[in-house]
């Protein structure tokens, strides 16, 4: 470790000590050396004893700077790890820092674009429109040299020298995280190293603005001509790793409820559309904006009777596969049907908990945790907290962490919070239920079969010529099987006709499995077709 990193580590530890964060170290023999080292090396006392632990942790992270502030914000969404009071305090952390010099921003932008700003833009404002820990944004207009002359744009630029700062602090976070499991079983359950790894990936992704550009373009295409969501246009010719240029939008912040009401916005429809936008992203697109807090969501001030969201800052997104979506849809439906056994089986079938999990105990654990939720009316039940409860139970049964679902659960909490802030009577279940049912129907109904056949048509054509040969080979093998079975049958006649029939059935089953094994390199449909054909032949022979 370098001298600079050692000084930074010392600063981090002393800051935590001044806020009494070391009180989480349990007084047990295992931590004796840590407590002695703390007294010998760090003569620092808790200077904020009158404040609750959550407040002290928030203040400590605030003092340590942007990287730690963003860590606290991320942890505030991990309610599967922390008590609600602590998570609520961390949610108060604000990722707002003093902007860096506008002239420096100009230099960075010009270096990225390869020329003077005046080549492309007029009215570049060196005063930042907004500033955060990773980047800040400036406004400008396309000039007469551009096809979109006069178009208002926003230029986002990464803070200079932020990457080495982030990497240095992340390295120290890993070092601190490696100490956490030694404290107690509860500390081990936090899986601190996994949390830091997840945070590192998020931060490094945010440092590459070309990712944000690609995400925004994809989300914009998904909701092209949509009445529900508008995503500002990106201008790829001006986008680089540390600079992007996008359309400037003018909207009402979704958290400004009074202005929305004064503008005549249909608040009920606005709240319902927030849920619809989220579930459309999840179940239709398998791709969702995963940073949908109030600062990134606006409402189009035009046509308030038909309100439209505007989404910005697509630096953090989530993706889901078919298995993830099936888990979500079936788990939610099973939960609301109080079918806790199905919920338990879903976790095992998804391979997220061990195959030898005790299903009865798993079901009972879900029942004990989830049943009290139904003391509330269905309209008041939080989907985010349902997922949280499912995760908490599953973790006790060694569920592997699923980062994509943790990200989704965080986003769902954001959406629910905003929806109920806009319209407190929002019925999440009634709004979301059609999405869940339609998706499940499409996966298991006639439509799903026809769609699958259509998708596999090229494979059918490619392998169709193999089908007659496969059937012929299977029938030839069946003739040999029948001959051998007849020979065997003669020797068993003395033992009774029933036993003979049983042997024939058993051996036939074994041979059929062998036939299928021989065709394991064929597509599933062809193997199944072969099996059906062989079975029909067996039935016909049995009748004869």
UniProtKB/Swiss-Prot annotation:
Its main location: membrane. It is found in: Cell inner membrane. One of its GO terms (molecular function) is protein kinase activity. Signal peptide: none annotated. SUPFAM superfamilies: Protein kinase-like (PK-like). Coiled coil: none annotated. The chain crosses the membrane at residues 522-540. GO terms for cellular component: plasma membrane. GO terms for biological process: regulation of ubiquinone biosynthetic process; ubiquinone biosynthetic process. ATP binds at residues 129-137, 156. The keyword Nuclease does not apply. It is an enzyme of class 2 (transferase). Keywords: ATP-binding, Cell inner membrane, Cell membrane, Kinase, Membrane, Nucleotide-binding, Transferase, Transmembrane, Transmembrane helix, Ubiquinone biosynthesis. Pfam families: ABC1. Pathway: Cofactor biosynthesis; ubiquinone biosynthesis [regulation]. Is probably a protein kinase regulator of UbiI activity which is involved in aerobic coenzyme Q (ubiquinone) biosynthesis. This is Probable protein kinase UbiB. The lineage of its organism: Bacteria, Pseudomonadati, Pseudomonadota, Gammaproteobacteria, Pasteurellales.
């Amino acid at each position: 470790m370098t001298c600079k990193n050692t000084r930074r580590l010392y600063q981090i530890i002393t800051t935590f000590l001044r806020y009494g964060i070391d009180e989480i170290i349990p007084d047990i023999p295992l931590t004796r050396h840590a407590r002695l080292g703390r007294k010998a090396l760090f003569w620092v006392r808790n200077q904020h004893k009158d404040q609750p632990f959550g407040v002290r942790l928030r203040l400590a992270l605030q003092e340590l700077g942007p990287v730690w502030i963003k860590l606290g914000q991320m942890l505030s969404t991990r309610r599967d790890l922390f008590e609600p009071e602590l998570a609520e305090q961390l949610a108060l952390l604000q990722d707002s820092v003093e902007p860096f010099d506008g002239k420096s921003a100009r230099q960075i932008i010009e270096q990225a674009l390869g020329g003077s700003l005046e080549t492309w833009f007029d009215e570049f404002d060196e005063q930042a429109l907004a500033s955060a820990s990773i980047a800040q944004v400036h406004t400008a207009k396309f000039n007469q040299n551009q096809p979109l002359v006069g178009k208002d744009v926003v230029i986002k630029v990464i803070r200079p020298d932020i990457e080495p700062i982030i990497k240095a602090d992340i390295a120290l976070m890993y070092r601190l995280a490696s100490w956490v499991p030694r404290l107690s079983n509860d500390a081990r359950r936090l899986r601190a190293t996994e949390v830091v790894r997840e945070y590192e990936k998020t931060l490094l992704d945010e440092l590459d603005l070309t990712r944000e550009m690609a995400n925004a373009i994809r989300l914009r295409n998904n909701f092209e001509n949509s009445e529900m969501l508008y995503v500002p246009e990106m201008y790829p010719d001006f986008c680089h790793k540390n600079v992007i240029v996008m359309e400037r939008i003018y909207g009402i912040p979704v958290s400004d409820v009074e202005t929305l009401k004064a503008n005549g916005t249909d608040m009920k429809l606005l709240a319902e559309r927030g849920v619809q936008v989220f579930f459309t992203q999840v179940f239709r697109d398998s791709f969702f904006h995963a940073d949908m807090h109030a600062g990134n969501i606006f409402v189009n001030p035009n046509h308030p009777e038909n309100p439209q969201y505007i989404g910005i800052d697509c630096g953090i997104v989530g993706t889901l596969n078919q298995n993830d979506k099936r888990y979500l849809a079936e788990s939610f439906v099973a939960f609301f049907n109080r079918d806790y056994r199905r919920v338990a089986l879903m976790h095992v079938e998804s391979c997220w908990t061990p195959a030898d999990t005790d299903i009865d105990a798993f079901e009972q654990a879900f029942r004990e945790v989830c049943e009290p939720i139904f003391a509330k009316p269905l309209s008041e039940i939080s989907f985010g907290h349902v997922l949280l409860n499912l995760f908490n139970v599953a973790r006790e049964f060694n569920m592997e962490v699923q980062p994509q679902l943790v990200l989704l659960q965080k986003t769902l909490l954001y959406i629910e919070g905003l929806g109920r802030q806009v319209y407190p009577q929002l019925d999440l279940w009634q709004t979301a239920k059609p999405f869940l049912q339609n998706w499940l129907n499409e996966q298991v109904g006639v439509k799903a079969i026809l769609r699958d056949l259509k998708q596999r048509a090229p494979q059918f054509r490619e392998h169709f010529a193999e089908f007659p040969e496969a059937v012929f080979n299977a029938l030839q093998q069946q003739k040999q099987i029948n001959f051998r079975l007849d020979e065997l049958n003669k020797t068993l006649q003395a033992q009774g006709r029933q036993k003979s029939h049983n042997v024939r059935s058993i051996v036939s089953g074994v041979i059929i499995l062998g036939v299928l094994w021989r065709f394991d390199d064929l597509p599933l449909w062809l193997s199944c077709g072969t099996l059906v054909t062989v079975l029909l032949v067996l039935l016909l022979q049995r009748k004869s």
